[in-house]
């Protein structure tokens, strides 16, 4: 029943999103006439080689209108982004509900483990579709935007992806990509599933062994302070794996769609680090350990 309700709400939100996008285009078309007038006014001023009081007053009015038009379009786009965020949240809730129903249903046969190639593709898609933080002028990037840490009292929700420190079969500890199943406030412990095992291996971990992944990408052009900087020590997901390893930032992203360039610690190289490898913002988190000597 909950799944049907979610589907109905998603359909409503998609219709609202389509309406908002239509309004965006209308707003843009309406403001285009004003922008053309600004351009023509500047051309006339260049032809006459003077800035008369008339042109100064006219331009002031045109720019005031252009600013108001841009703000109106911006407000519509922000509403559209809110709808997209709500749709993604509902899709995630539906996925978790379906997963729980699958776990506790005896009527259906157990699902097969996901093929590794499919899993890697899903992880790449998750990184690509991570929303970009777009704040209003003067807004500071929130916790879990890029390199910004979670608030001290933050508790990851079921379904959230995290870096989790677990004991491997050989007894060594490693950081893995995991999904939160639950959190016990009484015990201050998480239950997480290893992503690579499709829920077959579950770990109970203290909060200090769990690092929430970013929920927004930071925009290097507007919020560079929300990115890890060159030579900063991090934990990064090694490409084509589901494990996090210590690495140094070689270069932060330059554009919103860019990845980090990182140097993984690797004793097989003379300087102790691998050649630069690209890792998405989604899979780079702070490392609390000290840099190796």
Curated annotation (Swiss-Prot):
<comment type="function">
    <text>Chromatin reader component of some histone acetyltransferase (HAT) SAGA-type complexes like the TFTC-HAT, ATAC or STAGA complexes. SGF29 specifically recognizes and binds methylated 'Lys-4' of histone H3 (H3K4me), with a preference for trimethylated form (H3K4me3). In the SAGA-type complexes, SGF29 is required to recruit complexes to H3K4me. Also binds non-histone proteins that are methylated on Lys residues.</text>
</comment>
<dbReference type="GO" id="GO:0035064">
    <property type="term" value="F:methylated histone binding"/>
</dbReference>
<feature type="site" description="Histone H3K4me3 binding">
    <location>
        <position position="245"/>
    </location>
</feature>
<dbReference type="InterPro" id="IPR010750">
    <property type="entry name" value="SGF29_tudor-like_dom"/>
</dbReference>
<dbReference type="GO" id="GO:0000124">
    <property type="term" value="C:SAGA complex"/>
</dbReference>
<dbReference type="GO" id="GO:0140034">
    <property type="term" value="F:methylation-dependent protein binding"/>
</dbReference>
<protein>
    <recommendedName>
        <fullName>SAGA-associated factor 29</fullName>
    </recommendedName>
</protein>
<feature type="region of interest" description="Histone H3K4me3 N-terminus binding">
    <location>
        <begin position="240"/>
        <end position="243"/>
    </location>
</feature>
<dbReference type="InterPro" id="IPR047288">
    <property type="entry name" value="Tudor_SGF29_rpt1"/>
</dbReference>
<dbReference type="GO" id="GO:0005634">
    <property type="term" value="C:nucleus"/>
</dbReference>
<dbReference type="GO" id="GO:0045815">
    <property type="term" value="P:transcription initiation-coupled chromatin remodeling"/>
</dbReference>
<keyword id="KW-0539">Nucleus</keyword>
<dbReference type="InterPro" id="IPR037802">
    <property type="entry name" value="SGF29"/>
</dbReference>
<feature type="domain" description="SGF29 C-terminal">
    <location>
        <begin position="152"/>
        <end position="293"/>
    </location>
</feature>
<keyword id="KW-0175">Coiled coil</keyword>
<keyword id="KW-0805">Transcription regulation</keyword>
<comment type="similarity">
    <text>Belongs to the SGF29 family.</text>
</comment>
<dbReference type="GO" id="GO:0140672">
    <property type="term" value="C:ATAC complex"/>
</dbReference>
<feature type="coiled-coil region">
    <location>
        <begin position="12"/>
        <end position="88"/>
    </location>
</feature>
<dbReference type="InterPro" id="IPR047287">
    <property type="entry name" value="Tudor_SGF29_rpt2"/>
</dbReference>
<comment type="subunit">
    <text>Interacts with dimethylated and trimethylated 'Lys-4' of histone H3 (H3K4me2 and H3K4me3), with a preference for the trimethylated form (H3K4me3). Component of some SAGA-type complexes. Component of the ADA2A-containing complex (ATAC).</text>
</comment>
<keyword id="KW-0804">Transcription</keyword>
<feature type="site" description="Histone H3K4me3 binding">
    <location>
        <position position="238"/>
    </location>
</feature>
<feature type="region of interest" description="Histone H3K4me3 binding">
    <location>
        <begin position="264"/>
        <end position="266"/>
    </location>
</feature>
<feature type="region of interest" description="Histone H3K4me3 N-terminus binding">
    <location>
        <begin position="194"/>
        <end position="196"/>
    </location>
</feature>
<dbReference type="Pfam" id="PF07039">
    <property type="entry name" value="SGF29_Tudor"/>
</dbReference>
<keyword id="KW-0156">Chromatin regulator</keyword>
<dbReference type="GO" id="GO:0140003">
    <property type="term" value="F:histone H3K36me3 reader activity"/>
</dbReference>
<dbReference type="GO" id="GO:0070461">
    <property type="term" value="C:SAGA-type complex"/>
</dbReference>
